[in-house]
Amino acid sequence: MRALAFAAALAAFSATAALAAGALEAVQEAPAGSTEVKIAKMKFQTPEVRIKAGSAVTWTNTEALPHNVHFKSGPGVEKDVEGPMLRSNQTYSVKFNAPGTYDYICTPHPFMKGKVVVE
């Protein structure tokens, strides 16, 4: 059990380190006023959100199945950035520091797609 907890913490740390280097920044807690996206029924319930630069988005997995948020490389994202697997009721927050369009998927369920448009 400890090994599983350690592996999850290591994955979260790795994702945070990768995100902090660019336009995306993983944050430990959702900042006040962050935009929420629920994960339910095998989809991101709000498939596209629009926010201002410097704002954050928080994803909450409401299902029993684990899901994640995986940003695909493209403008503003030098390489793919894969967030940790979220179990039921876990959250993942990302602050967006630069304008752009950021597409993402759920790695184990690539038909689950979303987009963050930062103005």
Swiss-Prot record:
Matching Pfam families: Copper-bind (PF00127)
Give compartment(s).
Periplasm
Cellular component GO terms held in the UniProt record: periplasmic space
Name the source's superkingdom.
Bacteria
Query: GO molecular-function annotation terms?
Result: copper ion binding; electron transfer activity
Tell me which residues bind Cu cation. Answer: 67, 106, 109, 112
Q: Which InterPro entries match?
A: Amicyanin, Amicyanin/Pseudoazurin, Amicyanin_Para/Methyl, BlueCu_1, BlueCu_1_BS, Cupredoxin, ET_Amicyanin
Q: Tell me which positions the record assigns to the signal sequence.
A: 1-20
UniProt KW Cell membrane keyword: no
- PROSITE patterns, per database record: COPPER_BLUE (PS00196)
Q: What does this protein do?
A: Primary acceptor of electrons from methylamine dehydrogenase. Passes those electrons on either a soluble cytochrome c or to pseudoazurin.
PANTHER family found in the cross-reference section: BLL1555 PROTEIN (PTHR36507:SF1)
Q: What is this protein called?
A: Amicyanin-alpha
- What is the species listed in this Swiss-Prot or TrEMBL entry? Methylorubrum extorquens (strain ATCC 14718 / DSM 1338 / JCM 2805 / NCIMB 9133 / AM1) (Methylobacterium extorquens)
Lineage of source species: Bacteria, Pseudomonadati, Pseudomonadota, Alphaproteobacteria, Hyphomicrobiales
